[in-house]
C-alpha cells in the first residue's frame, strides 16, 4: 500500500499537450478505457471465457465484460456500490455463476462468426436510484431483480427445465348447468396484421466507431413474406 496522499484518488487521468497552431479549434479527444477489475470466480479465465472444474465459491480479481460479475460488483462494492449504503446486502453467488455461464455462451454474430451472448461495457456517470441502476444493469443479461429480507434476488429470462405443464386436464374451468363449458380454461388473443413488426431500427454504441451511436437496420425475411 502507498502512504502518499493522492489528489485524485480512484480516478484515471490523462493529459495531452498539443500545438494549437495545428488546429483551427480545440480537438476532440476520445479515449477507449478498459475499466476497473472486479471479483470473478477463481476457476474462471476472464480472457478466454472458460470455466475449469468445479467452483469452490472463492474469487479473484480480473478485468471482465461479463455483465453478471459487473452487476455483483455494483451491488457489493463498499466504495460506490449498494453495500456502501446497505451494509447487510447480499446476493446469491451460485445463481450469478449460472448467469455468467449463460452470458459467455457463444452465439452467431450475424457476420458468419460468433460472439458472447451478453457483454457489458458501461460508463456510469449519472446518479440514479438503486433500483433504477441495478435494473438497468440486469437488463444487459435479461435479468430482473427484487429485494427481500436483506438479500437481493436475481432471475434471468432464459430457457429452463419445465416446472409445471398446464392443460385442460389439470385446470379448473366453469361448467354450466347443462354440462357445457361456460368459461373455457384458456383464452387466446392475437394481434392485428398491421401491428406485427417485421423491421426494426436499433440504436447502439458501436465499438468499432469509438462507441458512437449508430442505427442498425434489421428485417425478418420470413415475416416479411408472411405479412
Where do the model's predicted regions map?
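Polar, S/T/G-rich
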Residues: 1-141, 148, 200, 210-212
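Surface-exposed, non-catalytic interaction/assembly patches
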Residues: 2-7, 20, 121, 134, ...
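Hydrophobic residues embedded in beta-strands of well-ordered beta-sheets
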Residues: 150-153
Amino acid at each position: 500500500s502507498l502512504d502518499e496522499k493522492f489528489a485524485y484518488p480512484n480516478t484515471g487521468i490523462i493529459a495531452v499537450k498539443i500545438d494549437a497552431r495545428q488546429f483551427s479549434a480545440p480537438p476532440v479527444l476520445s479515449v477507449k478505457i478498459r475499466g476497473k477489475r472486479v471479483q470473478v470466480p477463481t476457476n474462471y479465465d476472464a480472457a478466454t471465457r472458460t470455466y475449469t472444474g468445479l467452483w469452490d465459491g472463492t474469487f479473484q480479481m480480473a478485468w471482465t465484460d461479463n455483465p453478471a460479475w459487473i452487476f455483483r460488483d455494483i451491488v457489493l462494492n463498499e466504495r460506490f456500490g449498494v453495500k456502501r449504503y446497505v451494509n447487510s446486502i447480499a446476493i446469491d453467488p451460485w445463481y450469478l455463476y449460472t448467469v455468467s455461464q449463460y452470458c459467455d455462451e457463444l452465439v452467431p454474430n450475424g457476420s458468419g462468426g460468433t460472439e458472447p451472448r451478453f457483454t457489458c461495457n458501461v460508463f456510469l456517470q449519472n446518479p440514479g436510484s438503486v433500483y433504477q441502476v441495478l435494473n438497468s444493469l440486469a437488463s444487459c443479461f435479461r435479468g430482473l431483480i427484487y429485494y427481500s429480507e436483506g438479500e437481493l434476488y436475481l432471475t434471468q429470462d432464459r430457457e429452463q427445465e419445465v416446472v409445471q405443464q398446464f392443460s385442460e386436464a389439470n385446470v379448473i374451468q366453469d361448467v354450466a348447468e347443462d354440462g357445457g363449458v361456460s368459461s373455457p380454461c384458456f383464452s387466446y388473443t392475437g394481434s392485428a396484421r398491421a401491428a406485427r413488426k417485421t423491421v426494426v431500427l436499433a440504436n447502439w454504441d458501436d465499438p468499432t466507431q469509438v462507441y458512437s451511436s449508430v442505427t442498425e437496420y434489421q428485417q425478418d425475411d420470413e415475416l416479411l413474406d408472411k405479412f
